[in-house]
């Protein structure tokens, strides 16, 4: 299952959940990663308790169960092209509104769905835009999760740019509401991480967007989200950070570590931080002894 969706990806676009063995493997290998990703997103993003939730491409129901556990009073409607217990059959590429689904929703979730649809980036962006237009309440939230592969992540970033151009607001993880700077170089992409789901297992990496119909853009050019793991080498510490000022490499020499910049040692992927007093260089920002770093809420 992992090879079919992440490796050679020969299962992408197939109705693999109709196969009993593959469904069992998906439930044990992939579904827990969906749960971990959603838990991480909901823990770091302010989302009002939803009254109605639509789970698009529900798979084996991991998102539905996680949402019910978090918001027990929510009505959760789940759809997938392969039906299951409590999951309606629906082909989300045929109509914007799945057959049998009425009304609007406070929360839309599409986990590991877009990359499996027979649509190009423009088609995926139009589909998400139509979901938000026809299915989402005015103050609602749409959460998209995709695999943290280079191409699937870059595709999601390209979808992001089109959605922003269409007037939607990216509440997370982006602090920048302009074109994504990670798309400027082919090797760059963007993903976040959740804790490991079991001892001996790798951490859960994922790419995601939290979308709303409107929002207040961040204009503080000193504010950044960390978008890489720490890189320590040759007496220095480096991290990539992204915000209204762009996607920059932040660097500090070990000999310039000080009480005001020591937070850099503790920053993890996804953290939001204000960086004051850093020196602009050709390849990014250099934090010196007098630079001041302050952690902010996500």
Each model region followed by its residue ranges:
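Class I SAM-dependent methyltransferase Rossmann-like catalytic core
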Residues: 12-41
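Conserved class I S-adenosyl-L-methionine
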Residues: 50-59
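Conserved SAM-binding loop of SAM-dependent methyltransferases across substrates and taxa
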Residues: 60-71
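A short acidic, Gly/Pro-enriched loop at the edge of an enzyme's catalytic core
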Residues: 98-108
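A short SAM/SAH-binding and catalytic strip from SAM-dependent methyltransferases
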Residues: 106-121
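Conserved beta-strand signature within the Rossmann-like core of class I S-adenosyl-L-methionine
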Residues: 138-146
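Class I S-adenosyl-L-methionine
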Residues: 153, 157, 168-210
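C-terminal lobe and adjacent flexible extensions of AdoMet/dcAdoMet transferase-like proteins
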Residues: 193, 202-298
């Amino acid at each position: 299952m992992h090879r079919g969706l992440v490796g050679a990806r020969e299962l992408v676009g197939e109705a693999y959940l109709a196969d009993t063995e593959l469904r069992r493997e998906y439930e044990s290998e992939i579904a827990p990663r969906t749960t971990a990703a959603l838990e991480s997103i909901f823990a770091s993003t302010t989302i009002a308790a939803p009254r109605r939730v639509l789970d698009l491409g529900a798979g084996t129901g991991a998102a539905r169960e996680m949402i019910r556990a978090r918001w027990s009073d929510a009505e959760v409607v789940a759809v997938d092209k392969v039906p299951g217990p409590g999951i309606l059959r629906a082909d989300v590429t045929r109509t914007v509104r799945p057959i049998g689904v009425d009304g609007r929703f406070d929360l839309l979730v599409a986990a590991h769905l877009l990359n499996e649809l027979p649509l190009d980036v423009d088609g995926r962006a139009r589909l998400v835009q139509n979901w938000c237009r026809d299915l989402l309440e005015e103050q609602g939230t749409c959460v998209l999760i995709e695999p943290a592969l280079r191409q699937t992540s870059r595709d999601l970033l390209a979808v992001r740019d089109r959605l922003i151009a269409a007037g939607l607001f990216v509440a997370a993880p982006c602090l920048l509401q302009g074109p994504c700077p990670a798309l400027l170089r082919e090797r760059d992409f963007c993903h976040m991480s959740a804790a490991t789901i079991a001892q001996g297992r790798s951490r859960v990496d994922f790419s995601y967007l939290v979308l709303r119909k409107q929002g207040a853009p961040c204009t503080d050019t000193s504010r950044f989200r960390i978008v890489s793991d720490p890189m320590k080498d040759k007496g220095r510490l480096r991290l990539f950070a992204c915000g209204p000022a762009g996607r920059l490499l932040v660097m500090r020499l070990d000999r310039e570590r000080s009480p005001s910049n020591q937070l850099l040692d503790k920053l993890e992927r996804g953290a939001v931080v204000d960086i004051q007093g850093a020196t602009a260089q050709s390849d990014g920002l250099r934090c010196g002894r007098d630079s001041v770093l302050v952690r902010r809420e996500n």
